[in-house]
């Protein structure tokens, strides 16, 4: 670590990105913080690395500090919300997703907040979030993104008992990305909707 003493902040960030291990990268970001205690990006990056290591408890204080240092960065609030979400702090997570959306609307923040609304059975709020996310320009070009949003909204529609709309969203999501990692959710959801609507499985999936 002695060689890092002569590096400036920019060089240290570049070195952290080239680090061979997450632990090594964290050590470099800590060096940045020593040089610049107000560097919110370094705090956020350490939080992300701990999150990637499956250690949300260690990530939490870094995300909190990042939002304190730069309260106008929506990504920091979204990252903080995700950690709180993983720890089961639903109210705090929703609050921070809301701050993130107010600053920098993104499909992930909307989808994650919608998931929590579904958990709380606030289905109309979940539907509104997914619909808003699907209308965002540019960010939803990836099929996986849209597929997950349709799945979350379908979950909300099923919660409301609106199986016709749920079936539409399930079929749409599965058509967008048939190899999605949540394919089991689509299959179970479609079967449930078919049973509730009294239609054949083939008809429900739009078979010819």
PLM-predicted stretches and their roles:
Residues 31-34, 64-68, 98-102, 132-135, ...:
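Conserved structural position within tetratricopeptide repeats
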Residues 2-12, 175-208:
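Terminal, low-structured helical/coil segments at or just beyond the last alpha-helical repeat
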Residues 37, 71, 104-105, 138, ...:
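Short coil turns that delineate tetratricopeptide repeat
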């Amino acid at each position: 670590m002695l060689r890092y003493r002569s590096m400036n902040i920019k060089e240290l960030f570049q070195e952290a990105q080239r680090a061979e291990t997450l632990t090594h990268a964290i050590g470099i970001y800590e060096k940045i913080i020593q040089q610049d205690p107000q560097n919110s990006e370094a705090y956020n990056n350490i939080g992300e690395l701990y999150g990637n290591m499956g250690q949300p408890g260690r990530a939490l204080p870094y995300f909190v500090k990042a939002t304190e240092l730069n309260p106008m960065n929506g990504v920091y609030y979204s990252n903080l919300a995700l950690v709180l979400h993983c720890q089961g702090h639903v109210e705090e997570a929703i609050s921070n997703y809301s701050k993130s959306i107010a600053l920098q609307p993104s499909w992930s923040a909307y989808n994650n907040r919608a998931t929590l609304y579904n958990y709380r059975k606030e289905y109309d709020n979940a539907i509104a979030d997914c619909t808003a996310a699907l209308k965002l320009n540019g960010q939803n070009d990836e099929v996986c993104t849209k597929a997950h949003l349709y799945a979350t909204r379908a979950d909300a529609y099923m919660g409301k008992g609106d199986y016709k709309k749920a079936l539409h969203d399930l079929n749409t999501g599965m058509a967008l990305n048939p190899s999605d990692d949540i394919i089991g959710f689509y299959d179970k959801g479609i079967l449930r909707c078919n049973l509730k609507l009294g239609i054949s499985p083939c008809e429900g999936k739009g078979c010819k």
